[in-house]
Amino acid sequence: WIMGHMVNAIAQIDEFVNLGANSIETDVSFDKNANPEYTYHGIPCDCGRTCTKSEKFNVFLQGLQKATTPGDSKYQEKLVLVVFDLKSSSLYDNQASDAGKKLAKSLLQNYWKNGNNGGRAYIVLSIPNLAHYKLITGFKETLKTEGHPELMEKVGYDFSGNDDIDQVAKAYKKAGVTGHVWQSDGITNCLPRGLDRVRQAVANRDSSNGFINKVYYWTVDKRSTTRGALDAGVDGIMTNYPDVIAVVLSESAYKSKFRIATYEDNPWETFKN
């Protein structure tokens, strides 16, 4: 999965997919009542990027829905996975469940169209704080009460705080999560970061009793870093330059080992060689 980083305006969806992304990451900011409000990152952000592009969250979802619904004039067949980077650190811990509930309602109405031919992309809820695990339970409960528990088949999870992997496992246990787990590792492109924790996550993914299904590394803008991440065995790379990742994937060392994921590739299944 080539994951376009910080795609917060509808116009950027086409821009990143046309550069080779089959996945995008979108920032979600919340108001003080835990309502998802804007697709917005803010300052500071990655070096070389504008930090302030935004849409109202529900408006962005409507644009995203069009981009991921076959038959729509804006349909982008290659776009199969969306990571919502939930900026829940602005909330009190006891608001996490409410944030999950409100996020689910928003997606249900504006993206899934209440289960009536909505967008088809798989969704990852990426949470920055292990203490906010109730965001997951609130989200799940709401889809159930609204009569659409089947949509949870399209939803996966990530804790993005670079926490100790054992602690991440405990948070999932509390949330009742037993699958659909993506594990991120990374840092802004302005700073270097080693691959030690990525390797730990990959080892967990590939062990018989691991809880991780997929591992992605962020934010990667250079060919050399891309090669390092691929050598470590990641499933996804988040980038500001999807075309850079695509070029490396076409190199002889990688083209026989990796390919770009399509809609037929289940993002919740651990890949077995």
Curated annotation (Swiss-Prot):
Binding site for Mg(2+): 25, 27, 85
Location of the active site: 5, 41 (nucleophile)
Record's catalysed reaction(s): an N-(acyl)-sphingosylphosphocholine = an N-(acyl)-sphingosyl-1,3-cyclic phosphate + choline; an N-(acyl)-sphingosylphosphoethanolamine = an N-(acyl)-sphingosyl-1,3-cyclic phosphate + ethanolamine; a 1-acyl-sn-glycero-3-phosphocholine = a 1-acyl-sn-glycero-2,3-cyclic phosphate + choline; a 1-acyl-sn-glycero-3-phosphoethanolamine = a 1-acyl-sn-glycero-2,3-cyclic phosphate + ethanolamine
Main localization (coarse): secreted
Family: Belongs to the arthropod phospholipase D family. Class II subfamily.
Xref: Pfam families: GDPD_2
Functional description taken from the UniProt entry: Dermonecrotic toxins cleave the phosphodiester linkage between the phosphate and headgroup of certain phospholipids (sphingolipid and lysolipid substrates), forming an alcohol (often choline) and a cyclic phosphate. This toxin acts on sphingomyelin (SM). It may also act on ceramide phosphoethanolamine (CPE), lysophosphatidylcholine (LPC) and lysophosphatidylethanolamine (LPE), but not on lysophosphatidylserine (LPS), and lysophosphatidylglycerol (LPG). It acts by transphosphatidylation, releasing exclusively cyclic phosphate products as second products.
Source organism: Loxosceles deserta
BP-aspect Gene Ontology terms: killing of cells of another organism; lipid catabolic process
UniProt keyword Lyase, yes or no: yes
Cystines in this chain: 45-51, 47-190
Subcellular location: Secreted
Alphabetic keyword roster: Cytolysis, Dermonecrotic toxin, Disulfide bond, Hemolysis, Lipid degradation, Lipid metabolism, Lyase, Magnesium, Metal-binding, Secreted, Toxin
Gene Ontology molecular function terms on file: lyase activity; metal ion binding; phosphoric diester hydrolase activity; toxin activity
Cofactor: Mg(2+)
GO cellular component terms given for this protein: extracellular region
Tissue: Expressed by the venom gland.
Record-given protein name: Dermonecrotic toxin LdSicTox-alphaIB3ai
Cofactor note: Binds 1 Mg(2+) ion per subunit.
